């Protein structure tokens, strides 16, 4: 089987980021984003997606975390897009419901080649620690635009904003894991009647 890995470096005047992903990993993560809460969420993606994920980032955190969080989403999206290559033999679609105590989120993904995000979440507070919850949508928007996927994220219930966020990232990891799984019955086939994604 081909190695489904990718490494992407993104350098701008605002951020310097390197992301490495192995889709057939063991859920190991090496994370240094400079944003501790984001590292915690990225760890959920790796652990529940069973991806090996490395993120090293330096950003203009003296301004705020916006550029760093968004650009990590962009770079992760680019890495995923490279790792899935032509998408032959992939399941393509993935979905997951994940609870954490009172919180429950649903994530559905399609490796469609068409970027689209539906983000239906109302967080119960504006910050988690010192992390602005608006940046969660910015992360996923950056990811979607560069991974070229359709992504639906719905927080169905929750009172604790940390729990809401964590269920979203865990469900995302699990849905993505399902979508990138290879189906031996479709070994050399593109999972689309178009013949291309």
From Swiss-Prot:
Q: Which InterPro entries does UniProt cross-reference here?
A: IGPD_sf (IPR038494), ImidazoleglycerolP_deHydtase (IPR000807), ImidazoleglycerP_deHydtase_CS (IPR020565), Ribosomal_Su5_D2-typ_SF (IPR020568)
Protein name per its UniProtKB record: Imidazoleglycerol-phosphate dehydratase
Q: Its Enzyme Commission number? A: 4.2.1.19
- Keywords of this entry: Amino-acid biosynthesis, Cytoplasm, Histidine biosynthesis, Lyase
Q: List the PANTHER family.
A: IMIDAZOLEGLYCEROL-PHOSPHATE DEHYDRATASE (PTHR23133:SF2), IMIDAZOLEGLYCEROL-PHOSPHATE DEHYDRATASE HIS7 (PTHR23133)
GO BP terms, alphabetized: L-histidine biosynthetic process
Compartments where found: Cytoplasm
Which species is this record about? Nitrosomonas europaea (strain ATCC 19718 / CIP 103999 / KCTC 2705 / NBRC 14298)
Question: Gene Ontology cellular component?
Answer: cytoplasm
The entry assigns this protein to a family as follows: Belongs to the imidazoleglycerol-phosphate dehydratase family.
Q: What is the catalytic activity of this protein?
A: D-erythro-1-(imidazol-4-yl)glycerol 3-phosphate = 3-(imidazol-4-yl)-2-oxopropyl phosphate + H2O
Q: In which pathway does it act?
A: Amino-acid biosynthesis; L-histidine biosynthesis; L-histidine from 5-phospho-alpha-D-ribose 1-diphosphate: step 6/9
The UniProt entry, under HAMAP family, shows: HisB
**Gene Ontology molecular function: any one:** imidazoleglycerol-phosphate dehydratase activity
Q: Which gene encodes it?
A: hisB
Organism domain of life: Bacteria
Q: Which cysteines are joined by disulfide bonds?
A: none
């Amino acid at each position: 089987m081909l190695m489904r890995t990718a490494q992407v470096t993104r350098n701008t005047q605002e951020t310097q980021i390197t992301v490495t992903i192995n889709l057939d990993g063991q859920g190991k993560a090496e994370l240094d984003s400079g944003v501790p809460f984001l590292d915690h969420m990225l760890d959920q993606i790796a652990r529940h997606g069973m991806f090996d994920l490395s993120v090293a980032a330096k950003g203009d955190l003296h301004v705020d975390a916006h550029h760093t969080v968004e650009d990590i989403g962009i770079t992760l999206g680019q890495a995923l897009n490279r790792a899935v290559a032509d998408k032959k033999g992939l399941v393509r679609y993935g979905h997951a419901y994940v609870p954490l105590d009172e919180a429950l989120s649903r994530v559905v993904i399609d490796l469609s080649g068409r970027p689209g995000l539906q983000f239906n979440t109302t967080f119960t507070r504006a910050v988690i620690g010192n992390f602005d919850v608006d940046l969660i949508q910015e992360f996923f928007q950056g990811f979607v635009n560069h991974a070229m996927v359709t992504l639906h994220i719905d927080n169905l219930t929750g009172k604790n904003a940390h729990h809401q966020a964590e269920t979203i990232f865990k469900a995302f990891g699990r849905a993505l894991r399902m979508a990138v799984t290879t189906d031996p019955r479709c070994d050399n086939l593109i999972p689309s009647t178009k013949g291309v994604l």
